[in-house]
Amino acid sequence: MKIIIQRVNQASVSIEDDVVGSIEKGLVLLVGIAPEDTTEDIAYAVRKITSMRIFSDDEGKMNLSIQDIKGSVLSISQFTLFADTKKGNRPAFTGAADPVKANQFYDIFNQELANHVSVETGQFGADMQVSLINDGPVTIVLDTKNK
């Protein structure tokens, strides 16, 4: 799994001008699933995301987790994280899981995450418009292959 984690003050996702998910202070996650990902990768990612101390405490130090601040997550499926740009000018996405597995794992990931924090989602496979106000900005790349 590759997950882009962005700390935000607010974010929303729309499909055809209808808002389908929105959050206030929290995290936007762009989630990519690889063919070789397992449920252990999901557990690892959920543990890291919910425990990562990337929110400021009263002294301005990044010392609080998403759970500590009672923040929310906006989770967006993002197969393009596996773009291969080595040849030519059009990216190939053969490194992404097939849609059936990716959808299944994306759902499991969101369900596991929801056991710890409030989760809003986009719609798997849809053309979405994501709006967000970055906080910091703080942007972190989590790759479960680099445990």
UniProtKB/Swiss-Prot annotation:
Gene3D superfamilies: D-tyrosyl-tRNA(Tyr) deacylase. Keywords: Cytoplasm, Hydrolase, RNA-binding, tRNA-binding. It holds the Pfam family Tyr_Deacylase. Its main location: cytoplasm. InterPro entries: Daa-tRNA_deacyls_DTD (IPR003732), DTD-like_sf (IPR023509). The keyword RNA-binding applies. One of its GO terms (molecular function) is Ser(Gly)-tRNA(Ala) hydrolase activity. A motif (Gly-cisPro motif, important for rejection of L-amino acids) lies at residues 136-137. GO terms for cellular component: cytoplasm. It comes from the Bacteria. Its EC number is 3.1.1.96. It is an enzyme of class 3 (hydrolase). It catalyses: glycyl-tRNA(Ala) + H2O = tRNA(Ala) + glycine + H(+); a D-aminoacyl-tRNA + H2O = a tRNA + a D-alpha-amino acid + H(+). An aminoacyl-tRNA editing enzyme that deacylates mischarged D-aminoacyl-tRNAs. Also deacylates mischarged glycyl-tRNA(Ala), protecting cells against glycine mischarging by AlaRS. Acts via tRNA-based rather than protein-based catalysis; rejects L-amino acids rather than detecting D-amino acids in the active site. By recycling D-aminoacyl-tRNA to D-amino acids and free tRNA molecules, this enzyme counteracts the toxicity associated with the formation of D-aminoacyl-tRNA entities in vivo and helps enforce protein L-homochirality. PANTHER family: D-AMINOACYL-TRNA DEACYLASE 1, D-TYROSYL-TRNA TYR DEACYLASE. A Gly-cisPro motif from one monomer fits into the active site of the other monomer to allow specific chiral rejection of L-amino acids. Homodimer. Belongs to the DTD family. This is D-aminoacyl-tRNA deacylase. It comes from Streptococcus agalactiae serotype V (strain ATCC BAA-611 / 2603 V/R).
